[in-house]
């Protein structure tokens, strides 16, 4: 009897979804971009499984062109895979593509009902948060105010590695803990007992958000949201995350209310953490839309989910590529050691002199953008690109990974070659559409300066203080597995395990 009811329910649900899908087929009269033929109900969703989505979309683009149309369930999806198309979306029609989809389950949960700067809809509220991010949270002055935190945390990181010289260490894990530590102190003022749990929850969310959710394919069928396992999984993790952040928020509020933050009062702006900045803005109330606690927590989530993953993933990939390319490793080490040999240690004073290291970072971001498929956008109004119609409300995906490997713009695009950036004016500020590791247009990542500061110093220190060898079970660098993991951000699937050997001129040698 139970099987009968289940079968009947499944059949009725199938018919309902089919009817909804057919009802949405009114776009067939439009001149849509080319794409693979869809099948009933699923559309092209079945073609996006069994591999990394950014790889699959790149391969499909080779056949159907750099501007593609796909159907994922009832959702019309436009995929951009070339610099020319990206320029149309991020420059020519920037305003039309400045929105985010409002029908993705995970977005609603993680953004505290669209209260953050990353997911909130385009409009006055988003402009307000964008201004706060650019002018107060991630300005050059603000990022520089955290210099002592970065230098202290990285120095402790180097000492910890040095204490284990000649032994195998999991460098990927150590880098991740370092970046989280820096971000935690910048955001909250201190590390606390919940730091490890905080990291664990963010890692779980990164994986959970990347899992397919049928409710996202059929957003008009609200019933699917009620039975979505993915939704409840994300909600459960996020609830635990929220509890930690709320405790930290309450602590900051109590401290401000009781005037106990004497160090902040004595030293002015320089000692304020990011939560202090947000709470001060909240108290001033000088924005059109009040900044409530949900907005503050949503922005904190942005800082950790975007900032930490971008930096730690990039440092990890850079070390992987240099291990695989020892000539490049040697050049980078020689540069850092030449600049800092007299000091015996790296600080941020002379980082601007490390031209080759900056090229290594740029090349790493080209080959391994932390978010290979930029967060989806939504077309606000029907428009035309390259003679094709882009329907209103269609979901838009830009394949930054494919664009960074476009052979029409990059010589030997699959090779790791930092020299290509030494005399190049290509940058990641959104003006070079062949290079979009941080996105482009109005929605470009507001935390670029913060992320880069957390990449440059750790890399420079790792290169200065140590020579590196693969662990004994990974002696063949040509066979170093560069397979990517699955998730919104793309790390290396296997952690990088190396053996450090102290550099003779390091001022820390023998003092670990």
UniProtKB/Swiss-Prot annotation:
A single GO cellular-component term on record: endoplasmic reticulum membrane
Entry's localization field: Endoplasmic reticulum membrane
Membrane topology, record value: Single-pass membrane protein
Tissues with expression: Expressed at low levels in roots, fruits, stems, flower buds and flowers, but highly expressed in young leaves. Detected in adaxial and abaxial epidermis cells.
Lumenal compartment residues: 1
Residues in compartment: Cytoplasmic: 23-512
Gene Ontology molecular-function annotations: heme binding; iron ion binding; tabersonine 16-hydroxylase activity
Residues engaged in binding heme: 445
Coiled coil: none
Pfam families from the UniProt entry: p450 (PF00067)
Source superkingdom: Eukaryota
Primary site of residence: endoplasmic reticulum
GO annotation terms (biological process): alkaloid metabolic process
PROSITE patterns tied to this protein: CYTOCHROME_P450
Record field: catalytic activity: (-)-tabersonine + reduced [NADPH--hemoprotein reductase] + O2 = 16-hydroxytabersonine + oxidized [NADPH--hemoprotein reductase] + H2O + H(+)
Enzyme Commission designation: 1.14.14.103
UniProt cross-references to InterPro entries, sorted A to Z: CYP450_71D (IPR052306), Cyt_P450 (IPR001128), Cyt_P450_CS (IPR017972), Cyt_P450_E_grp-I (IPR002401), Cyt_P450_sf (IPR036396)
Description of what induces expression: Not regulated by methyl jasmonate treatment.
Membrane spanning residue stretches: 2-22
Cofactor: heme
Family: Belongs to the cytochrome P450 family.
Biological function: Involved in the foliar biosynthesis of vindoline, a precursor of vinblastine and vincristine. Hydroxylates specifically tabersonine, 2,3-dihydrotabersonine and 2,3-dihydro-3-hydroxytabersonine, but has no activity with naringenin, tryptamine, secologanin, strictosidine, ajmalicine, vindoline and catharanthine.
PANTHER family in the cross-refs: OS06G0641600 PROTEIN, OS08G0105600 PROTEIN
Protein's recorded name: Tabersonine 16-hydroxylase 2
Organism per entry: Catharanthus roseus
């Amino acid at each position: 009897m139970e099987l009968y009811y289940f079968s009947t329910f499944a059949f009725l649900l199938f018919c309902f979804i089919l009817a909804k899908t057919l009802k949405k087929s009114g776009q067939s009269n439009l001149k849509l971009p080319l794409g693979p033929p869809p099948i009933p109900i699923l559309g092209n969703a079945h073609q996006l499984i069994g591999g990394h989505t950014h790889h699959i979309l790149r391969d499909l683009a080779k056949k159907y062109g750099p501007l593609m149309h796909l159907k994922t369930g009832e959702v019309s999806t436009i995929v951009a895979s070339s610099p020319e198309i990206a320029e149309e979306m991020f420059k020519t029609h920037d305003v039309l593509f400045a929105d985010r989809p409002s029908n993705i389950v995970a977005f609603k949960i993680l953004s505290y009902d669209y209260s953050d700067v990353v997911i909130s809809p385009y409009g006055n509220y988003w402009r307000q948060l964008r201004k706060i991010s650019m002018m107060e949270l991630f300005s050059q002055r603000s990022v520089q105010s955290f210099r002592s935190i970065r230098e202290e945390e990285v120095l402790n990181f180097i000492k910890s590695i040095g204490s284990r010289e000649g032994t195998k260490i999991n460098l990927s894990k150590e880098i991740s803990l370092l970046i989280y530590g820096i971000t935690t102190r910048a955001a909250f003022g201190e590390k606390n007992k919940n730091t490890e749990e905080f990291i664990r929850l963010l890692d779980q969310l990164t994986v959970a958000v990347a899992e397919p959710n049928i409710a996202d394919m059929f957003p008009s069928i609200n019933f699917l949201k009620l039975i979505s396992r993915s939704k409840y999984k994300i909600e459960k993790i996020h609830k635990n995350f929220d509890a930690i952040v709320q405790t930290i928020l309450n602590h900051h509020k109590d401290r401000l209310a009781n005037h106990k933050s004497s160090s902040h009062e004595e030293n002015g702006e320089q000692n304020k953490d990011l939560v202090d900045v947000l709470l001060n803005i909240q108290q001033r109330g000088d924005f059109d839309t009040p900044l409530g606690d949900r907005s503050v927590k949503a922005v904190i989530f942005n800082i950790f989910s975007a900032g930490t993953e971008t930096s730690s993933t990039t440092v990890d990939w850079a070390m992987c590529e240099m291990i695989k390319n020892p000539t490049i490793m040697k050049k980078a080490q020689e540069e850092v050691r030449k600049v800092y040999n007299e000091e015996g240690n790296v600080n941020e004073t002379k980082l601007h002199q490390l031209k080759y290291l900056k090229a290594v970072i740029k090349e790493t971001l080209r080959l391994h953008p932390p978010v290979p498929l930029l967060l989806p956008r939504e077309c606000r109004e029907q428009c035309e690109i390259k003679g094709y119609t882009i329907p209103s409300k269609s979901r838009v995906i830009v394949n930054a990974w494919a664009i960074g490997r476009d052979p029409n713009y990059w010589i030997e695009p699959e090779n790791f070659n930092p020299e290509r950036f030494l005399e190049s004016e290509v940058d990641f500020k959104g003006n070079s559409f062949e290079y979009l590791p941080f996105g482009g247009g109005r929605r470009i990542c507001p935390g670029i300066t913060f992320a880069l500061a957390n990449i440059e110093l750790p890399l420079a220190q790792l290169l200065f203080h140590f020579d590196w060898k693969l662990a004994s079970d990974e002696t063949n660098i040509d066979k170093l597995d560069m397979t990517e993991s699955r998730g919104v951000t793309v790390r290396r699937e296997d952690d990088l395990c190396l053996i450090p050997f102290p550099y003779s001129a390091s001022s820390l040698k023998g003092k670990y």
